[in-house]
Amino acid sequence: MLRAVFFATRMEAERVLAEKKFGYKQICAEPFRVWRNRRNLIVITGIGLVNASVAFAWAARKFRFGDVLNVGAAGATAFGGKPVEMGKFYKISKVVCLEPYNEMAFRLGRAGRALVSSGSPVSTREEREYAGKFAPLVDMEGYALARAAEVFGKKISMVKMVTDFSHECDIFGNIKKMSEKFAQMEGVWI
């Protein structure tokens, strides 16, 4: 059965999609862009909690897939524990949400780092300190995808790369580097 891989942006998936040996062909352009090879569906959700949850629900109704993988960028918070490193990949073990009325925590595995998801960018020092009370990594889609996976009975795993740690970072340059590193993980894509 196919695995569904969710990216927030095309930029994150760019090198994987461009690599001919992976054999991805675009099969859908609206309402979400989707590519497929023999092993995976790649779905571009758009940025944010709402886009991620809607894309997951749409994909779950339109395509047959088994396990789910969310791959993408994450920011470093001002977490008081073991720090995360810029440019490094982290497997996510737990996902929580910064937004009110989203108190559930999702355990994705025993090993890895915690991730907190936010409905808006976490870019100021104060915002990073607040997010750091919950997890060392922050994104804008993980919680929504974990919640949707639970609703649709899918096992989800997540891999995030630290692309930013302050408002002054070159997040777009770092995401391009991340995309190149993702494409080097051949076993995931073929």
Where are these regions (language model features)?
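Gly/serine-rich nucleotide phosphate-binding loop at the start of the catalytic core
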Residues: F6-V16
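Ordered hydrophobic segments in well-structured contexts
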Residues: A4, A8, F32-V34
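Extreme N-terminal starter segment of soluble prokaryotic enzymes
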Residues: M1-A4, N40
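Short, solvent-exposed amphipathic alpha-helical segments in soluble enzyme
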Residues: K20-F22, A59
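Glycine-rich phosphate- or other oxyanion-binding loops that anchor nucleotides, phosphorylated ligands
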Residues: I27-I190
